[in-house]
UniProtKB/Swiss-Prot annotation:
UniProt GO BP: Gram-negative-bacterium-type cell outer membrane assembly; lipopolysaccharide transport
Functional summary from the UniProt entry: Together with LptE, is involved in the assembly of lipopolysaccharide (LPS) at the surface of the outer membrane.
Signal sequence range: 1-24
InterPro entries named in the record: LipoPS_assembly_LptD, LptD, LptD_C, OstA-like_N
Subcellular location: Cell outer membrane
Family: Belongs to the LptD family.
Keywords: Cell outer membrane, Membrane, Signal
Tagged with keyword Membrane: yes
HAMAP family in the record: LPS_assembly_LptD
GO cellular component, one term: transporter complex
The protein, known as: LPS-assembly protein LptD
UniProt entry tagged with the keyword Transmembrane helix: no
Organism domain of life: Bacteria
């Protein structure tokens, strides 16, 4: 129908219309439509010349530069050099609430005539405005209804612009045929733009990405369903001056219900040069989830070779979906990965599974899966997780450098059910562990809790504010299956005694608070009962099968506040001085007749001075007659609440030796002095914690312990961080811990081993070198092992409408010895590549690259893209 419309309109608008005896006759005239003139007075006389008409993007005589300028004007592109993309699309429109509510159509023009059939022929700046549709053109033939109150259909020609304000659609064409009753229209040759939602990250904000797809088609048709059909066209996300890439197609269908675009028989072009044939391609036009193939991934793992992944996403329902991914490894064969996610009113969870039907190198089938779910109904919460892996090297071979997986030695298997309100905290836990490496000895395998039941009560709300009565109850069945023994010659063996433990702890606490300080005395009475199931095969044996322990804990926490406000040219500040005393008394009790089920020592840090027990868990309660004295100072900006500086320093004075240790059973401790060489010291280290905003964007933190008696620093952790408004990041962290009690294994405890030192340094950065180029890197070195533990380097080129990223990583995949977590394994190389077309998403393992960068302190997900 569109063929010949333009010629017909030229004939119509080249005539003067008049009526002769009910017959309409059209008489040709050279110039019935007035041209625009620009006039001014010169020497008392009018001087006029024809106004310069804007160039048409369809003019074949235009140069490339002129055509880009014309297209930018037609699509309402506003130049703004300060933006990375050089500008933005304007969405100015004539939408009014009154127009929508009236459901009427506004029609305006400069000149018009009617024929005898109710057809209006309008010319000169024709505008047709509806609630969510705007039509502009030079000329129009408009068919009205019987009483001339509404438009049935129209044909426009000339410089035609179609706008849909609600969606941001803008179409520039030469011909338009529209049915106003059902909202359909078709055009001839057309340029257009389509809006889409942008992620809230810096590289996709208004300044860094336009947020629009634009394109061209020989014909553009909007159907009654709202779907859009294009023929012989292309789409891209570049601005009108950016033609870096295009996806062309003989047919491009845009489904406005599913918000998907489908391209058939097309090409992927770079700078107008076809580089890939695309028989079929689909992509979203917004951020909603839908079924379809996702972008392939490319990676390399030294254990498995080169991998190519092809994912397919099933949007099964609004509340559950499925992702299937086939990965072809050059050295291993095919691995099938699947992730099923669901969400209901009360539950949500996911199942992740992987299957290698036949591993070329291993000659067998391999697999893994993880099932996790959480639930909530009013005050009831549930949590379930179960992990499985077929063999100890599975994660190493197929994880492609995922640090969280390749260092796993245990598999979580847990179920939790809790009920909480203002007065009750209760729960049921069933916890067990799977072993990744079968060489993990039985003493280093944690106990299962089959099950554990807790009930904690508090009087808050029933007693005065200064008084709190509480009770803690924890009943646990501990169980451990047999495993390989410690094969070191002469080494003591860990016990696998099973037991039931009941822990009851009533407590009374007072809280006397004033604006200038506080006093908080408390008295607690932990009662422990153990029923041990000794076995004849146990190397470590316990004399009594029934053990009861009762220990009172008396504590006083007191402090004062001294505040001072001051103002300078930078704002108003508050400086606070907070001296604090913390006294604890617990009588000594020999606890070597109690096994270690969930107990270990903690590293000495500043906040640990304000805990009554230096052991974790419930199997050891230290004896104490000690006083902590500390002072804290801080400066806070009252205008924004930020802390400019914070300093804390304190020490503990011991009035009795610390006699309780981790010795257990008849094995005693081979070398108790090695495990805790400071148990007879009169004073603890001087412990400190500092945080400073050195200057704008630069922060320094430090934790330092200094032992006065030994005259050495045995605990030091430093971190220097920089992050500016352009997301440039630089971090340096260093830690040196002379006695790392946190790393002691149960086997080392049984051997009475000395805590191992730890010394590492980490450098990391995300640096935007220019508007286009960026680098990211991390380097972690272990001084004790004298080797790199983790290193990666990435490079990004970020263009206006596309981005490319590459990353190399070298990581210690597994512990050389699962019974010694401080010992690093061999380093393995991993390579990743990602190519992203902004507006369409990424090609490559965006999640893998993102997971690497999340190891950098201060990195925000999406800064290097995360797909769209």
């Amino acid at each position: 129908m569109l063929k010949g419309i333009h010629k017909y309109l030229l004939m119509c608008f080249g005539t003067v219309l008049f009526t002769v005896q009910a017959n309409a006759a059209r008489i040709m005239s050279n110039n019935p439509i007035k041209e625009d003139w620009q006039c001014k007075v010169v020497d008392g006389e009018w001087s006029c010349k024809r106004a310069k008409k804007p160039k048409s993007v369809f003019d074949k005589k235009l140069t490339k530069t002129e055509k880009e300028k014309a297209l930018a004007d037609d699509l309402a592109w506003v130049k703004k050099p300060s933006y990375f993309v050089g500008g933005y699309y304007s969405n100015d429109n004539q939408f009014t609430k009154a127009l929508c509510e009236s459901k009427k159509t506004d029609l305006s023009y400069e000149k018009s005539e009617f024929d005898n059939y109710g057809t209006l022929i309008a010319s000169g700046n024709v505008q047709v405005l509806q609630c969510d549709q705007e039509l502009y053109g030079n000329n129009a033939i408009i068919n009205l209804n019987s009483n001339n109150s509404a438009i049935r259909s129209l044909v426009m020609a000339g410089d035609v612009i179609v706008k849909q304000p609600s969606t941001g659609i803008v179409i520039r064409t030469t011909e338009l045929d529209a049915d106003m009753n059902n909202g359909t229209y078709s055009t001839g040759e057309a340029y257009f733009r389509l809006a889409r939602e942008m992620p809230k990250t810096r590289i996709y904000d208004k300044e860094h990405f336009s947020g629009y797809l634009r394109g061209y088609a020989k014909t553009f048709k909007k159907e009654s369903s709202g779907d859009i059909v294009l023929s012989d066209g292309y789409i891209t996300s570049g601005d009108p001056y950016d033609n870096a890439w295009k996806i062309t197609g003989n047919n491009i269908d845009i489904d406005t219900n599913t918000h998907m675009a489908y391209v058939k028989n097309g090409y992927f072009e770079i700078q107008d040069i076809p580089v890939m044939y695309i028989p079929y391609f689909s992509h979203p036009i917004d951020d909603r989830r839908r079924s379809g193939f996702l972008y392939p991934g490319f990676l390399q793992n030294a254990n498995s070779g080169i991998g190519i992944s092809v994912p397919y996403y099933f949007n099964l329902a609004p509340n559950y979906d499925l992702m299937l991914q086939s990965v072809i490894w050059s050295q291993r064969g095919i691995i099938e990965n699947g992730t099923f996610r669901y969400m209901t009113k009360y539950f949500q969870g996911q199942f992740e599974g992987s299957l290698v039907p036949y591993d070329f190198k291993e000659g067998k089938m391999r697999s893994s899966f993880t099932l996790s779910t959480t639930g909530q109904y009013e005050n009831i919460n549930t949590n379930f997780k179960y992990e499985y892996v077929s063999d100890q090297n599975y994660y190493n071979d197929f994880s492609a450098g995922n640090v969280n997986l390749v260092t796993k030695t245990l598999l979580d298997r847990e179920f939790d059910l809790t009920y909480t309100n203002d007065y009750v905290d209760s729960g049921l836990t069933v916890l067990d562990y799977g072993v990744v490496n079968p060489l993990l000895t039985v003493d280093n395998t944690p106990y299962a809790k089959l099950p554990e039941v807790k009930l904690n009560l508090t009087s808050d709300g029933y007693t005065p504010d200064y008084l709190t009565l509480s009770a803690q109850t924890l009943n646990t069945f501990f169980y451990k299956t047999a495993g390989p023994a410690n094969t070191n010659p002469g080494a003591p063996q860990g016990t696998n005694v099973n037991a039931f433990r009941a822990y009851e702890s009533p407590k009374i606490a007072f809280n006397f608070n004033k604006t200038w300080g506080y006093l908080k005395p408390s008295l607690e009475l932990p009662i422990r009962y153990y029923k041990l199931n000794n076995k004849p095969t146990d190397i470590i044996k316990f004399k009594n099968s029934n053990v009861t322990s009762v220990l009172p804990i008396f504590n006083i926490d007191a402090g004062a506040y001294f505040d001072k406000d001051y103002t300078n040219e930078n704002g108003t500040y508050t400086s606070t001085l907070h001296p604090r005393l913390f006294y604890t008394y617990i009588p000594y009790q020999d606890q070597t007749n109690i096994p270690l089920f969930d107990t270990s020592l903690q590293n000495e840090q500043y906040m640990q001075m304000f805990q009554v027990n230096r052991f974790t868990g419930y199997d050891r309660i230290n004896n104490a007659n000690q006083l902590t004295y500390a002072i804290e100072a801080s400066t806070t900006n009252q205008d924004n609440g930020t802390t400019l500086a914070s300093a804390k320093i304190g020490q503990m004075a011991y009035f009795a030796d610390r006699k309780v240790n981790l010795c257990q059973g008849n094995s005693a401790c081979p070398n108790p002095g090695l495990m805790d060489p400071f148990s007879t010291d009169t004073f603890s280290p001087i412990m400190s914690s500092f945080e400073f905003q050195v200057m704008k964007n630069i922060y320094l933190s430090a934790q330092v312990n200094y032992r006065v008696k030994q005259q050495n620093v045995d605990y030091q952790v430093y971190q220097l961080s920089y992050k500016d408004e352009n997301e440039n990041i630089f971090n340096v962290s260093y830690n040196n811990i002379a006695n790392n009690w946190n790393s002691l294994t149960q086997q080392q405890i049984a051997e009475g081993a000395k805590p191992q030192p730890q010394e590492t340094i980490t450098l990391s950065t995300v640096l935007n070198i220019t508007d286009h180029w960026g680098i990211a890197a991390l380097w972690n070195y272990n001084f004790q092992q004298k080797q790199i533990a983790n290193i990666f380097a990435g490079l990004q080129y970020n263009a206006k409408s596309w981005a490319v990223r590459a990353l190399w990583q070298k990581t210690a995949y597994t512990n050389q010895d699962p019974n010694n977590p401080t010992l690093l394994g061999p380093l393995v190389n991993t390579y990743m590549f990602e190519f992203e077309l902004k507006g369409l998403g990424g090609i490559g393992n965006t999640s893998d690259i993102s997971s690497r960068l999340q190891q950098i302190n201060g990195y925000q997900v999406g800064e290097w893209g995360n797909g769209i």
